[in-house]
Amino acid sequence: MRFVALLLLTAAALGTAATPMLAVRGPQRVQVTALEFEYRLSRLSVRQGPALIELVNYGEDEHNLVLRRVGGTKRWRIAKILPGSHATLALRLRPGLYRLQCMVADHSARGMRATLRVRR
């Protein structure tokens, strides 16, 4: 009986040892809600790597989104979307601070901007 119990424990241990321990992570998601004259981010901080930035327009005007890493020159854009619409941007984020702005008319000057922190 002891031999059977030992055999079962050994088989169970071997079965779990063969199972990969690394979890595959998909892209992180950040929803940017556009209102009259503010952005609300679903999260203020994400890990570096693949990300999906979704702009959802709950406002009454058209809005867009321009994303730029502080100290960087590259810009990512979501074109103007109508009220009630949404659009998604897929990108790979490096550590640092990213500024988000609505570049429609004077929206950014009126407060339609936010900051996203990307950590290691």
Would you name each region that the model predicts?
Residues A5-G15:
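Bacterial N-terminal signal peptides
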Residues T19-R25, R29-T33, E38, I81-R120:
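Extracellular/periplasmic metallocenter environments
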Residues G26, G49, G59-H63, R110-M112:
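Short loop/turn segments at connectors of secondary-structure elements within structured domains
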Residues R40-S42, W76:
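Surface-exposed, proline-enriched loop/turn segments that connect beta strands in immunoglobulin-like
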Residues S42-D61, A87-Q101:
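Beta-strand cores of secreted/periplasmic/IMS beta-sandwich domains, seen most often
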Residues N64-R68:
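Beta-strand signatures of extracellular beta-sandwich domains
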Residues R69-G71, S108:
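Solvent-exposed strand-loop boundary residues in beta-sheet-rich modules
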Residues G72-A79:
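Surface-exposed loop/edge segments in extracytoplasmic proteins
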